[in-house]
């Protein structure tokens, strides 16, 4: 099944503590979750690892967010949108449902 949201897509957060924020998708996990740049930041207590040169302390990092809690951003309308699929020239492409423009 093709992914409606992919890496480097710009998304809007629909629910949670970062609701309304816009950011790019850094990673898509196979569990149906996404890691979005600067969204859902959590503080992780990191042990020092001198072999890898990692300092210890409290580190802020992005936690995964459920894919259903984000929507792809449509730059033409400036709003959140839904994605559909269609075939053009024998290739499967993604398009925005509101205005039928192709997702870049």
From Swiss-Prot:
S-S pairs: none
InterPro entries with a match to the protein in the record: KOW (IPR005824), Rib_uL2_dom2 (IPR014722), Ribosomal_uL24 (IPR003256), Ribosomal_uL24_KOW (IPR041988), Translation_prot_SH3-like_sf (IPR008991)
GO cellular component, one term: ribosome
Pfam families, per the entry: KOW, ribosomal_L24
Any one Gene Ontology BP term: translation
Record bears the keyword rRNA-binding: yes
Gene3D superfamilies tied to this protein: 2.30.30.30
Listed GO MF terms: rRNA binding; structural constituent of ribosome
TM stretches of this protein: none
Keyword line: Ribonucleoprotein, Ribosomal protein, RNA-binding, rRNA-binding
Subunit description: Part of the 50S ribosomal subunit.
Family (UniProt): Belongs to the universal ribosomal protein uL24 family.
Function summary: One of two assembly initiator proteins, it binds directly to the 5'-end of the 23S rRNA, where it nucleates assembly of the 50S subunit. One of the proteins that surrounds the polypeptide exit tunnel on the outside of the subunit.
Name this protein carries in UniProt: Large ribosomal subunit protein uL24
Species annotation: Shewanella sp. (strain ANA-3)
